[in-house]
């Protein structure tokens, strides 16, 4: 077997904690390599193509692009920084020969930095560390270098990985430098470091073909598109190849490659053939899935598929049966819901979907609340109407039959005066304080290990307790023996007593009991939750009640009644809020929280039984 290097290619992934600037860095590499015309209007974070990615400023799906520097084509993959989308990170790292780790010059190494770095080190990939945002006034690049080296040591990096080059950059200002004290002029130091530090792909172009499919794209004209790296051999348009299923290698089928693409800038460019080291997109194969291998017809040997981290959290997705069901959504039936959820499995390897004992509900398991909430938001925008239950963690059993539960590392930055309240709340939720440091600017960093179920519903409380000044980052740590019962929400719900339209007078009386979620003029139904009670129990309130009229007293003006602005819940806040006997109703226009049992008498009977 004659192994050869493709010195004209480098394959590199950019990995980072959420919001440390990697997508902006890719934008700058695209601009400075001449992908865009000089006068072309370019959107910020051009790699984040999905609406939710642009709105939230996070990357959810791994993206492929390529730039040419000198005579070398650099294939760049921008990966998600959040552990909930770790399935994406783990897969795409199989396509590359090195990684650029982007770390914020102020925040330093964070929980997700550890997560993505662990995955890269496990595959023995060389690392280039890019300390980004060095132009921030509070930047501390020298300390951040030490933090990254400590993290590499902690994660048992090899000697080669420990000897990683450091680049100091401001992606926003468009420069990089090899010295933290010297401001650069362009991105040349980073380009040069990629060429010198990331090895050229190696393989035998005459050997039997092997292409591992790492991502699936979809185009309504050509259907499913498989994306992967040519590990050995050569793939050709109109050539016959063997598709080997990663679940069952005995499942093999002969297929034809109708179109073949390589990446150039943000575009896919049609090519006739591709050989070792090339990252290609292949269309014309209807049954292609993530993890499958395209092989030589006469020598169909599959590449082992990277085992993806298991889900830790589950929710039920349920057909909406509220009194307002079907009035705002386009896709509302059980068939619609089932088809959409199972379709998601084609592109999301971290997701699990199971049928339940009723055709109206499906159990959906994912890597965390963000993972599932992004799916919910996508479905909502597509016109789906459905309900979801409170998230629940997925337990495991040890060898002796004991219960194991998932725990997370939480790193929290709060102003000093709020640290006591945070420690108290997390301790109640079975959190263990592992480390506490205070810096000169009056901020305390707390490091906790806490059960995943202890974090469900906590983020809303955290924002209240820290007056919106706290930052919490979490990362899955592993499974430990069950830590015992946790007492949850200390406040009950305000429940609408009757179906109708809310009025100022009814809301004015209800707001004395707690915090409202709705304004006057909103349609409500009996059993719908319209606010949070100040006390622990649930209370029924009549928000449709108008002022009683009499001969001696006119109704007066409702304008004289002053209502506090309602608390409008985001999707994540609403998911955090619901209890086990409640559901979140989701339509393209509205989020409504409701009791599972809408009838008040039936609800009382059920609570007595429990």
Regions found by a protein language model. Name each.
Residues 1-610:
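Structural and coupling elements of P-loop NTPases
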